[in-house]
Amino acid sequence: PFTYVKNSYIASPEFARGMPDFIKVCNVVKTFKQTRILQVGPRPFDFWTVICNEGELLERFNISLSPVPIQEVVQEIKKVKEQQPDKLQAVIDYFETNTEVQISARDLEMVAALKVALQNLCESYGCNAGVIQCWTALQDEIGILPYASLSLLQEEGLPFVCETDVHGAISELLVEAASLGEHRAIFADVNCRHPENENGELLQHLGVFAYSTAETKPILPQRHFVFDYPGSVAFRAIKIGRASCRERV
């Protein structure tokens, strides 16, 4: 069930391959044991596939959640706008430099403020990842979708997963830990069993990818393809081997 680094010379291929693998495994275990996840809002009713057992995660694996209401995020956004103008402007500058911005300056400011606010809350609660209820209560409060903000958090090594998918956030953390933080995880946010193939599943990406996974320049469109709100991001992801995808969230 496991492998080990056999007795070998330091200059041997076996040692060169085995030692990095050992370090990566240690990093995965360390990350798993030190995970706390910020949960913004409750699970949407229809998303039964993302139910998790919070008590079991804590008792068996010491993985804890830090639930916060959406209103707390709204208050943090106000603080960011009033007290952290430099951080806010730095995020705005990033979007203006690295994306094709098609939304208004006001909406772009809100996208940037949401990113900083979520980052602040993760720091305050000691969280290394987050999950969020993406719609529609958030739009009622701040008028934007969170995807462009979340993609930037992903880019900076703070995984955020949609619709409070706690297991998805844990998966991202472990994948990135296995690469020692050199690569960003790509997570298919909605996965459902195939209706005919018992050994198959349907992957539909409804979450967020890091900007570094983009093959084309990301676009911040005026509206989402489903919801009439700004705050989404669209780009074609880099093709790796047999897998490729197009993000439009």
Regions picked out by a protein language model, each given a short descriptive name:
Residues 2-7, 243-249:
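Short intrinsically disordered, low-complexity coil segments enriched in acidic
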Residues 1-89, 95-99, 103:
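Cap/lid and interdomain-hinge subdomains that line or gate substrate/regulatory clefts
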Residues 105-108:
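Active-site helix-to-loop segments that bind/position phosphate- or nucleotide-bearing substrates
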Residues 56, 60, 110-119, 123-248:
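Anaerobic metallocofactor- and corrinoid-dependent redox/one-carbon enzyme cores
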